[in-house]
Amino acid sequence: MSEDEKLPQVIMDPADYEALKKRLDELEKKVENTNAELFQLAGKKVGRDIGILYGLVIGIILSYILPALIKIIQILSLKVLVQQ
């Protein structure tokens, strides 16, 4: 900062200053809580989307595996019936 610029100075009653600090702290807490809630909602949406994606992938994998698995079970059950 150059010497030309001077910081503004304010003379204030200490009690008013403390009251102002308390009010600013309360406002800061409200802003932090609001931001936390917004991030939590965004996290829930992302989690839901990831869950849907996992469900689709597992469903697609099972749609390919289950018919083959059913055929294998049928073949094995026929072999068991033939041997008896």
Swiss-Prot record:
Residues spanning the membrane: 50-70
Recorded catalytic activity of this chain's protein: 5-methyl-5,6,7,8-tetrahydromethanopterin + coenzyme M + 2 Na(+)(in) = 5,6,7,8-tetrahydromethanopterin + methyl-coenzyme M + 2 Na(+)(out)
Keyword Cell membrane: yes
Main localization (coarse): membrane
GO biological-process terms attached to the record: methanogenesis, from carbon dioxide; methylation; one-carbon metabolic process
Entry membrane topology: Single-pass membrane protein
EC id: 7.2.1.4
Pathway annotation from the record: One-carbon metabolism; methanogenesis from CO(2); methyl-coenzyme M from 5,10-methylene-5,6,7,8-tetrahydromethanopterin: step 2/2
Source taxon at top rank: Archaea
GO cellular component annotations of the record: plasma membrane
UniProtKB keywords: Cell membrane, Membrane, Methanogenesis, Methyltransferase, One-carbon metabolism, Transferase, Translocase, Transmembrane, Transmembrane helix
Cell compartments where the protein resides: Cell membrane
Entry's Gene Ontology molecular function annotations: tetrahydromethanopterin S-methyltransferase activity
One Pfam family of this chain: MtrG
Enzyme class: translocase
Magnesium keyword on record: no
Subunit structure of this chain's protein: The complex is composed of 8 subunits; MtrA, MtrB, MtrC, MtrD, MtrE, MtrF, MtrG and MtrH.
Role noted for this protein: Part of a complex that catalyzes the formation of methyl-coenzyme M and tetrahydromethanopterin from coenzyme M and methyl-tetrahydromethanopterin. This is an energy-conserving, sodium-ion translocating step.
Homology family: Belongs to the MtrG family.
NCBIfam families with a match to the protein in the record: mtrG
Designated name of the protein: Tetrahydromethanopterin S-methyltransferase subunit G
Classification lineage: Archaea, Methanobacteriati, Methanobacteriota, Methanomada group, Methanococci
Gene expressing this chain: mtrG
